[in-house]
Amino acid sequence: MALQDAIRTWKGTIRVDVRAQDGNIAVVGTSCRFPGADGPRQLWRLLAAGRHAITERPPGRRGPNRTVAPPWGGFLDAVDEFDAEFFGISAREAASVDPQQRLVLELGWEALEDAGIVPDRVRGGRLGVFVGAFADDYAHLVHRDGATAATRHTYPGTERSLIANRLSHFLDVHGPSVGIDSGQSSSLVAVHLACQSLLTGESDLVVAGGVQLNLLPESVDIADRWGPLSPDGRCYTFDSRANGYVPGEGGGLVVLKRLEDALADGDTPQCVILGSAVNHGGNGHALTQPDELAQQDVLRRAHERARISAAQLQYVELHGTGTPAGDPVEASALGAVVGSARPRTRPLSVGSVKTNLGHLGAAAGVAGLIKVAMAIRHRELPASLNYELANPEIALDELNLRVQQDLGSWESADGPLIAGVSSFGMGGTNCHLVISDAPPPSTAPRREPETGEADSGQAPPVLPFVLSGRGSGALCGQAARLRSLVVERPDVVLVDVAYSLAADRAVHGHRAVVVASGREQLLDRLGVVAGGGAGAGCVSGVAGPGRVAVVFSGQGSQRVGMGRELYRLFPVFAAAFDQVCELLDPVVRAAVFGEEGAGGLLDSTEFAQP
């Protein structure tokens, strides 16, 4: 009942009409590989600094002949690199597998780890996988070599429909495994469908998102013929200089749970999806022309399902491609639905991550979602770049909208932080999500030693930090990444890090343990392991078959109070000790801890040598 009351209280701050908690989905983990950002933390650094990751097309993406499209874009590094052995794939098969499939495998593992879920523990469970994708560039590259160059791995390796299936197969999970193609809205539609799967009980846990890799130069040329790309490599969302979009690539996944399940499991949601909607505009316009009425409708439906009023939105992450045709339509729809519902003194803030990364195609929507999740976490709104003067076709003041032009504090005096995320496919499939910050985590009462319960609120004086990898290089890399995290996050709670490493990470054959009593000592010793060295407080090696040793210490090694510190600091030890006392004799606790009235019980043979 306490959990349900907490959810009702939190929901009451969002709307007056407090309804059942059905419909809220927690984002408990994220992973991404975007231009200039190999993960959510790196993405936030890019956004907070107001930087972009647009570059000239790398040499390997230019093709044998000079392409006609502008050379700019957002690109990933080393898309050809893949740890095939880690995922149980032979080198021969890996060469035939689309890098989009390979990237989703990596992102799936990282997203589960970010959620504190050991992948082995979901085997056989109802974990659903929903992945948006529409690019087939690798298949086209393979087809150039002709059928005689194909192997038995080529067909499944290049089938886009297998992107989600391969992750489900690797994890050995039995929930739905679905590929989504609704054009540029694919990844956000995948998240929408994933939420439905959770709400119907079809899945208990879901990994959802999208992927896009632009490996074929001709694909960009064809896109330029359809709707011109920005000639100067900048996305001018809502700006008077809007002249086309910038192609980008990447992948992003989120791990979703029903909110009540996430809170009951002790998860810390990064944000909450309050509601979502998907629609199409029919044939009222040309196939690839955006439909304002359809966009208005998808906004209203999402707000209705989230059970919020439009006035409660504080920010909207735009589709925002920077095209002369698309931006005015999106702005007009937002103004009609949201801007008109807000006080004129508080225009709606809007922005687009496409100004930082380019248009990530099938992964564009999930990029916006992860941006908003990070903004909620930091309680700051990053700037939407390249905005100086409003597009003359967009009357921002009349629409009651404002472009977020700098990194600003995001606070709400009258309730949770609430944002919208939009993503529209070129064929007319529109999707909108309503996102909120999560309810505060419940705090369990502190357990006191005198009552037979551990005090989990105090960290032990020395902490073990457990690391592992499939090989020595991977182990060193883990140590380096952990060290980087501790350097970048001076506020990180070390006992939480130690716990997560010990309890919420898969354990591999190459292992190391670093023992440290503080931040500086931890940094020093992680540096040693990262460099492949050894030293005080660092133990590393390769795991072998375990062996059992039974130690009989004899009489005389006991002392009064022995184990009290362990009992006070570690709830698991306390629970086991209490269980032993119940099975043997409750007086054991008094004897070991030297409690008042216990006298010299510990010197008695009955207790000293049972």
Each model region followed by its residue ranges:
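Condensing-enzyme catalytic core of the thiolase-fold
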Residues: 2-455, 505
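Flexible catalytic loop/linker elements that gate and position reactive groups at enzyme active sites
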Residues: 30-33, 52, 290-305, 315, ...
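Short, solvent-exposed alpha-helical surface patches in well-structured domains
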Residues: 42, 333, 476-477, 524, ...
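A generic structural signal for nonpolar/aromatic side chains embedded in well-ordered alpha-helices
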Residues: 46-47, 76, 223, 238, ...
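Short coil/turn segments at secondary-structure boundaries
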Residues: 57-63, 88-89, 121-123, 494-499, ...
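Short, glycine- and charge-enriched coil/turn segments that flank and shape catalytic ligand pockets
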Residues: 64-66, 118-120, 145-149, 340-347, ...
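A non-catalytic, amphipathic alpha-helix used as a structural packing/dimerization or gating element
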Residues: 103, 107, 477, 481, ...
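FabD-like malonyl-/acyl-CoA
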Residues: 469, 536-610
